[in-house]
Each structure stands twice: as C-alpha cells, then as structure tokens.
C-alpha cells in the first residue's frame, strides 16, 4: 500500500463502485445506507487497494514529463530488457495473492491505516 493513512470519502467510494460495475445503493445512497447495520455508505471490500490511486507519490502512478514504463508500452505491457532474449528473467512478476482482514465495514468518514507485511514468495520450477 502506498500510503500510511487514507481518509475514506463518499465520492471515492461511489466512483470505485461504479468502476467495478456494482450498483448496490449502500455504496452511494446515504438515505438507503442509514437504514442498514453499518449506518452509512460503506466501501466495497476491494476498495482498500484503490487508495494508492489517490497518492501522488505512488510508484506505479504515471509521472508528468517521465516516460511511462507500464502496460501498453509493448504488446504484452512489458518492455523487454536489452539483450534479455525470450527466456526467464525478461518477463514481469505475477501477483499471486493478497490477504485482507476486516474487523468492521469501511464507512465513509473513516481513516484507513495500512500495515504491510512480507508474505511467502516462490518461483515456478
């Protein structure tokens, strides 16, 4: 996660829910959400990963005046290393797993605090 603390805003929740195609009114309708157990607009479970998109220093965010290194730069989205050939080591990494522990719903107005812990790593044989 790119930021240590991230305030959760109702507008960000609504835009995120729209972007994933989830029209559940608990993600945008304050009047509807007041009648639910959480008592307010809540964020979809995967919203926590979206906080990086609002951090101007996030390392994967495009930077003005700097060449883009990410997807669509090449046919696969991976720019080959010079002299890298086609074998192992010239490809990109694979994000295999994430784990989240939720203690309560994330409600608009909350502040999200992230803790990053290294997980297991492995290589394909």
Language-model features, listed with the residues they occupy:
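Hot-dog-fold acyl-thioester-processing enzymes
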Residues: 1-95
């Amino acid at each position: 996660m790119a930021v240590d603390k991230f305030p959760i805003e109702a507008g960000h929740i609504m835009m995120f829910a729209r972007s994933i195609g989830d029209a559940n009114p608990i993600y945008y309708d304050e009047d509807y959400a007041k009648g639910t157990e959480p008592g307010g607009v809540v964020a979809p479970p995967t919203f926590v990963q979206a906080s990086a998109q609002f951090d101007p220093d996030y390392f994967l965010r495009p930077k003005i005046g700097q060449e883009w290194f990410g997807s669509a730069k090449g046919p696969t989205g991976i720019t080959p290393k010079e002299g890298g050939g086609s074998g192992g080591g010239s490809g990109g990494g694979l994000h295999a797993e994430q784990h989240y522990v939720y203690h309560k719903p994330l409600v608009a107005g909350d502040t999200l605090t992230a803790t990053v812990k290294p997980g297991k790593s492995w290589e394909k044989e």
